[in-house]
Amino acid sequence: MNNFSNLVDALIKDEMEGTPRHELVLFLGKTPELLQAVAGFPDYDLVITGKVIGKVCFDHGIGPSLLKRLPDIINSPKSIFRSANQHQTDSVIVLTYELKGLAPIIMPIRHSQSIGRNGVFNIITSVYGKEGPDPEVKWQKQGLQLWTNPI
C-alpha cells in the first residue's frame, strides 16, 4: 500500500471517530502533463485536503477504494473541460471513466492555489458523481471541452 492510500485510510478512520483532520494536505504527485499542456496548469504538486477527502467520502458517497486510486485516475481522464462558471478561470473539470451508480464521476481542479504556509499547489476541490443529463454532451455543446481521450 502506498503513502497516499494509507493517509486516505487514516483520514477516513479519524473522521469516523469524530476527530477529522481537515487541515492535512495529501500529495498525489506532480500535476499530470496533460493538464499542463491542455489547460495551462503550472508544474506544481497536485494535492487534495483532508477536508475534501471527508466531504467526498461522507457527503458524496465516494468509497475509500476509489479515493485511494485518485493518483491513477487523474492520469487517465476521459475528458477535460473548462469550468462553466465564468468567474473560475483557474478551474477545469476532469471527467473520469469511473461511475457512482449511473453518474459519471468528475473532479473539479483549480490551479495555483495557496494553502496556508505550505506553498502554492494545484488542488482537487471535490470528487463526485455528476447526476442528471449526460454532462459530457452538455459541456461539449457549451464549447467547454478542452480535450477528450481519442480512444
Where do the protein language model's features map onto the residues?
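Ribonuclease/tRNase effector modules and their secretory precursors
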Residues: 1-151
